[in-house]
C-alpha cells in the first residue's frame, strides 16, 4: 500500500539518470514492480494526447488509436483517482472515454531528440471553453483577466480531451513553445490539482519576430510638405525659401521685438519721472526725432479729449511686461464713481479691443494727471495716419507757387474696408453687450496692429473724463453707431468734412462701392423711427455675407501661420548636433586610452571640428564665418553624400569622407560613450 503523499500536487521534473541510486530508490518507491523502459508510456501522450516524435524514434510506449493510454501493456495495476467528466472535445479531435491520470504517469519522462539543447519541459495547456472554435494559426497571448466561472472545471487532474482540444499544432511545432521552466510547470500542476487557475501565470510570450517592429523616430532633417491649403496654392511658390519662415514674417516679428526695447537703457527719458507707481523706464511714444526742439513733456491738446494726452511706454515691476501709459494732463476728479466702470473694462478681453489694465491719478508729473494703463502693441499705427493724414507737400516750386492743399492718402479697397467694418462691429457688439459705450470712436483712436488687424484704443477714457450717471448708456451707444457711420464715410470719401451734409458722400459711395456698403452707411447715419432705436445686432445682420469672407481670410491666415510654425518645430537640431560633438571630442578621462584618443571615428570628428570651427585664412587669421558653420552642420544633419577633405593639424595627412559617413561616426561614438557612461560620475 502506497504511503499517503504530502501534497496532492506532483512536481514534474527531469527524470533522473538510470545509473543514479536516487533514481532507483524513487522508482522502487512509486512502482511495486520494475517495468521495462519500452513499456513506459510517453508523457507526451498522457499530457497532450499524442506525441509528435512517435515516428521519429521515440523509445517510449505509444498506445494505438482508440486504446486507453492509461493502461499500458504488461503493466501492473496501480491505484487511480477518479476524474470527473471533461467538456466535449472539439471537432476533428478523436473522442475518448473518460481517462484517468495517475501519479506515476505524471512522473513519466518526455522524449526530446538529441538535436534539442534545451531541457525537456512541458508546455502549459490552456483551459478551453465547451464551445471554443478551432484555434487560429496566429497564436494570441493569454489574457491576464479572470476566467469565467464556466471555463474552470474543478478537478484533481485535467482529462485528455481537455489537453488535446486546446493544443495548437503551431505551438508544438516550435520548440520555444514546448520549452517551459520547471517552476512554471510545477505551479500549473499545483493549480490543476487544487482546481484553481492563476490568470497571471501565463506562458511566456511568443516569438517577437511574429510582431511588427517598434516605430522608429522621425527623421527631423527631412522637411515635410506644406499644408494642402498652402501647397496647392499657385501663389505660394515652392522655392528654397519656402522651407523656412518667410522673410516678411521674420522681419515683422523681429521689428516688433526690437521696438519693445528701443530707447530703453534702464532709465526714463529726460524730463520724465524714473518711477510711476510700479512702472519704470518711461519712454514717450512715438519716439521723438533727434532734431526735436521741444522736450518730451510738452504735447499738444488732443482733438478727441480736449486735453494734452501724451502716451508713454513703461515696464512693470510686477510682471516685467511692457505697457502703454496714456496720461491726461490737468485732470480734475469730480466724482469717485467715475472709476466704477473701470472694473468692467479690465475684465473685457477681446481681439479687437486694446485691453485696459488699470487707471489711477498721480501728481508725479507736477500736476493732477490721469493715467490709463493699456496693453502695448509695438509698431502700431492708426487709421488716421494710414488713410486720413495729409501727405507731406512735394518739394517742387510749382506746388509751392500754386499753394495747393496737401492731398490725403488713398482710400482702402472695398475688400479691406469690409474687413475693418467687420472688426469694428465685432468690438462694438462686445462693448454694447457689456452695458458700456466707446464714446470716442475716431480714426485716431483705432490702432492698426498688423496686416488688416485693428483694435479700438482709448476705451474707458471718456467714462472718467466726462462722467455722467444721468444719461442712459443707450444714448451713448446710439452715438457710437453714428460715429461708426461717419468713420466709414471718411474712409471712402476724400472730400468728406464733418460739417458738410451727407448727400454728396452717399452719392459718391453709391457710384464707387457696392450697394451693401451704401445701405449699411445709410442705416448708421439715419435717425431711427419714433419709438425705435438702432442696434448693433441689426448692423451685424446687414453685413452677414461679408462676415463669411472675413472668416475665410482668418482661417487661411491661420493655415499660413501654422505652416510657418511647422518649419521651425525642429529648429534645435543643430544644437543637438553640437551637443553630441561636445560630448565626444577631447574627453579628459580618455586622454591615456589609446582606443579612444585620435583613433577611428573620434579622429574623423576631431578633424571635422577643426574644418568647421578652426579654419584659418591665407593671412593666418581665424575665419569667423557663421554661414560656413551653418551650412556644414546642416549638411551633416541631413547626411549628404557630398564629400569633404579633412586635413590634419600638421598638414601631413588628409581624409576624404562624406557627410553621411561623418554622421555615422557621430552616432557610433556617441552610442559607445553612452553605453560606457556612468551617471554618478562627478566632473573633475
Curated annotation (Swiss-Prot):
UniProt remark on domains: The N-terminal zinc finger binds to poly(A) RNA. Contains a pseudokinase domain. The protein kinase domain is predicted to be catalytically inactive because some of the residues important for catalytic activity are substituted and it lacks the equivalent of the binding site for a peptide substrate. However, it has retained an ATP-binding site and ATP-binding is required for mRNA degradation, stimulating the activity of the PAN2 nuclease in vitro.
Keywords: ATP-binding, Coiled coil, Cytoplasm, Metal-binding, mRNA processing, Nucleotide-binding, Zinc, Zinc-finger
Location(s) in or outside the cell: Cytoplasm
Family, as annotated: Belongs to the protein kinase superfamily. PAN3 family.
Primary gene name: PAN3
Subunit structure: Homodimer. Forms a heterotrimer with a catalytic subunit PAN2 to form the poly(A)-nuclease (PAN) deadenylation complex. Interacts (via PAM-2 motif) with poly(A)-binding protein PAB1 (via PABC domain), conferring substrate specificity of the enzyme complex.
Protein name, as recorded: PAN2-PAN3 deadenylation complex subunit PAN3
Compositionally biased region (Pro residues): 127-139
Signal peptide: none
GO biological process: mRNA processing; nuclear-transcribed mRNA poly(A) tail shortening
Pfam families, sorted: Pan3_PK
Amino acid at each position: 500500500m502506497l504511503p499517503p503523499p504530502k501534497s496532492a500536487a506532483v512536481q514534474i521534473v527531469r527524470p533522473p539518470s538510470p545509473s543514479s541510486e536516487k533514481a532507483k530508490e524513487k522508482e522502487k518507491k512509486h512502482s511495486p514492480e520494475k517495468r521495462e523502459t519500452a513499456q513506459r508510456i510517453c508523457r507526451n501522450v498522457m499530457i497532450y494526447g499524442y506525441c509528435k516524435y512517435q515516428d521519429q524514434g521515440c523509445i517510449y510506449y505509444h498506445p494505438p488509436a482508440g486504446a486507453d493510454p492509461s493502461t499500458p501493456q504488461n503493466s501492473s495495476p496501480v491505484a487511480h483517482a477518479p476524474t470527473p467528466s471533461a467538456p466535449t472535445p472539439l471537432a476533428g479531435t478523436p473522442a475518448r472515454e473518460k481517462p484517468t491520470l495517475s501519479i506515476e504517469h505524471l512522473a513519466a519522462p518526455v522524449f526530446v531528440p538529441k538535436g534539442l539543447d534545451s531541457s525537456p519541459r512541458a508546455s502549459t495547456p490552456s483551459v478551453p471553453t465547451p464551445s471554443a472554435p478551432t484555434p487560429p494559426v496566429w497564436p494570441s497571448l493569454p489574457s491576464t483577466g479572470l476566467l469565467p466561472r464556466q471555463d474552470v472545471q474543478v478537478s484533481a487532474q485535467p482529462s485528455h480531451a481537455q489537453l488535446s482540444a486546446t493544443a495548437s499544432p503551431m505551438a508544438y511545432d516550435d520548440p520555444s513553445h514546448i520549452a517551459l521552466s520547471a517552476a512554471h510547470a510545477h505551479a500549473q500542476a499545483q493549480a490543476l490539482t487544487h482546481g484553481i487557475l492563476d490568470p497571471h501565470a501565463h506562458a511566456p510570450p511568443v516569438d517577437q519576430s511574429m510582431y511588427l517592429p517598434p516605430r522608429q523616430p522621425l527623421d527631423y532633417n527631412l522637411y515635410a510638405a506644406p499644408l494642402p491649403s498652402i501647397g496647392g496654392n499657385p501663389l505660394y511658390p515652392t522655392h528654397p525659401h519656402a522651407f523656412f519662415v518667410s522673410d516678411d514674417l521674420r522681419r515683422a516679428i523681429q521689428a516688433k521685438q526690437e521696438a519693445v526695447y528701443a530707447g530703453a537703457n534702464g532709465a526714463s527719458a529726460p524730463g520724465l519721472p524714473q518711477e510711476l507707481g510700479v512702472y519704470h523706464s518711461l519712454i514717450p511714444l512715438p519716439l521723438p526725432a533727434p532734431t526735436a526742439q521741444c522736450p518730451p513733456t510738452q504735447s499738444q491738446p488732443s482733438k478727441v479729449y480736449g486735453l494734452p494726452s501724451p502716451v508713454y511706454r513703461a515696464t512693470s515691476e510686477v510682471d516685467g511686461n511692457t505697457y502703454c501709459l496714456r496720461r491726461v494732463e490737468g485732470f480734475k476728479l469730480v466724482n469717485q464713481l467715475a472709476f466704477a466702470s473701470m472694473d468692467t473694462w479690465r475684465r473685457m478681453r477681446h481681439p479687437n479691443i486694446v485691453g485696459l489694465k488699470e487707471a489711477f491719478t498721480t501728481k508725479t508729473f507736477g500736476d493732477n494727471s490721469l493715467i490709463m494703463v493699456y496693453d502695448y502693441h509695438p509698431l502700431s499705427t492708426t487709421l488716421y495716419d494710414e488713410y486720413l493724414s495729409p501727405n507731406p507737400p512735394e518739394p517742387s516750386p510749382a506746388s509751392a507757387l500754386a499753394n495747393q492743399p496737401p492731398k490725403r492718402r488713398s482710400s482702402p479697397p472695398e475688400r479691406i474696408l469690409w474687413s475693418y467694418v467687420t472688426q469694428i462691429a465685432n468690438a462694438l457688439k462686445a462693448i454694447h453687450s457689456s452695458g458700456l459705450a466707446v464714446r470716442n470712436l475716431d480714426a485716431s483712436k483705432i490702432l492698426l496692429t498688423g496686416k488688416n488687424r485693428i483694435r479700438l484704443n482709448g476705451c474707458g477714457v471718456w467714462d472718467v473724463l466726462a462722467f455722467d450717471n444721468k444719461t442712459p448708456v443707450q444714448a451713448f451707444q446710439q452715438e457710437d453707431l453714428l460715429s461708426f457711420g461717419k468713420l466709414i464715410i471718411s474712409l471712402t470719401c476724400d472730400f468728406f468734412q464733418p460739417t458738410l451734409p451727407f448727400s454728396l458722400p452717399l452719392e459718391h459711395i453709391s457710384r464707387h462701392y457696392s450697394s451693401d456698403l451704401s445701405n449699411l452707411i445709410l442705416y448708421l447715419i439715419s435717425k431711427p423711427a419714433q419709438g425705435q432705436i438702432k442696434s448693433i445686432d441689426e448692423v451685424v445682420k446687414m453685413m452677414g455675407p461679408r462676415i463669411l469672407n472675413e472668416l475665410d481670410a482668418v482661417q487661411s491666415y491661420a493655415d499660413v501661420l501654422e505652416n510657418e510654425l511647422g518649419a521651425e518645430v525642429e529648429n534645435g537640431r543643430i544644437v543637438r548636433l553640437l551637443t553630441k560633438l561636445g560630448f565626444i571630442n577631447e574627453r579628459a578621462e580618455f586622454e591615456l586610452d589609446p582606443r579612444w584618443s585620435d583613433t577611428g571615428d573620434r579622429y574623423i570628428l576631431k578633424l571635422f571640428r577643426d574644418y568647421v570651427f578652426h579654419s584659418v585664412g591665407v593671412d593666418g587669421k581665424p575665419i569667423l564665418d557663421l554661414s560656413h558653420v551653418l551650412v556644414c552642420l546642416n549638411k551633416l544633419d541631413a547626411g549628404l553624400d557630398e564629400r569633404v577633405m579633412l586635413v590634419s593639424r600638421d598638414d601631413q595627412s588628409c581624409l576624404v569622407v562624406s557627410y553621411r559617413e561623418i554622421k555615422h561616426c557621430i552616432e557610433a561614438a556617441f552610442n559607445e560613450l553612452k553605453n560606457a557612461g556612468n551617471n554618478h560620475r562627478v566632473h573633475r
